[in-house]
Amino acid sequence: MAHQNEQRGGGDRGRGRGRGRDRDQERDDELVDKLVHINRVAKTVKGGRNFQFAALVVVGDTKGRVGFGQGKAREVPEAIRKATDEAKKNMIRVPLREGRTLHHDGKGRHGAGKVVLRAAPPGTGVIAGGPMRAVLETLGIQDVVAKSVGTSNPYNMIRATMDALKLQSSPRSVAAKRGLKVGDLVNRRDDGASSPEAIEA
């Protein structure tokens, strides 16, 4: 009898693991991935040079989560797979206003790259360059104006964009920090404040 109970218990645990895998698969099915850049790189070794492909991939759920990853391999598909897996592990959550744009304007930088993100009214669309557009669209933003200065390097542009997104704050979180009501912040933002600094002033 004890042996039978152990078997049943093991089966339950197995089914639990199966349900966990199913949930992970469902989450993966909801994700959108975009290949931003791929190039061939060479590494000098004692016997000569080894060539690999380097891939840059952005992954998001179009509902406020996004991440990016890099992968290297001798074959393009493997490099893309590695980059995609890394992007899934590095996803961040960004609060969106009305589920379509940013709560406030923001700036980000990485190395020589600088980006400016501006919240936009409905119908504006995603006005942004290639690497930035990939991040913003997979994040789920529908209306935004983005500008990049200082670099055309896709790696720096994406890192700078992610830097700007990490600084986004919703009225609820700002209100909690300031001990104010959300309604007060929203009213002040509608009067012309478009950044956390302006809201908190």
UniProtKB/Swiss-Prot annotation:
Keyword Ribonucleoprotein: yes
InterPro entries linked to this entry: Ribosomal_Su5_D2-typ_SF (IPR020568), Ribosomal_uS5 (IPR000851), Ribosomal_uS5_bac-type (IPR005712), Ribosomal_uS5_C (IPR005324), Ribosomal_uS5_N (IPR013810), Ribosomal_uS5_N_CS (IPR018192), Ribsml_uS5_D2-typ_fold_subgr (IPR014721)
Domain S5 DRBM per the UniProt entry, residue ranges: 31-94
Lineage top rank: taxon: Bacteria
Region listing for Disordered, in residue ranges: 1-28, 173-201
PROSITE patterns documented for this protein: RIBOSOMAL_S5, S5_DSRBD
UniProt keywords, alphabetically: Ribonucleoprotein, Ribosomal protein, RNA-binding, rRNA-binding
Example GO BP: translation
Record-level Gene Ontology MF annotations: rRNA binding; structural constituent of ribosome
The keyword Calcium is annotated on this UniProt entry: no
GO cellular component: small ribosomal subunit
Pfam families: Ribosomal_S5, Ribosomal_S5_C
Its biological purpose: With S4 and S12 plays an important role in translational accuracy.
Note on domains (UniProt): The N-terminal domain interacts with the head of the 30S subunit; the C-terminal domain interacts with the body and contacts protein S4. The interaction surface between S4 and S5 is involved in control of translational fidelity.
Family: Belongs to the universal ribosomal protein uS5 family.
Subunit structure, as described in the record: Part of the 30S ribosomal subunit. Contacts proteins S4 and S8.
UniProt-recorded name of the protein: Small ribosomal subunit protein uS5
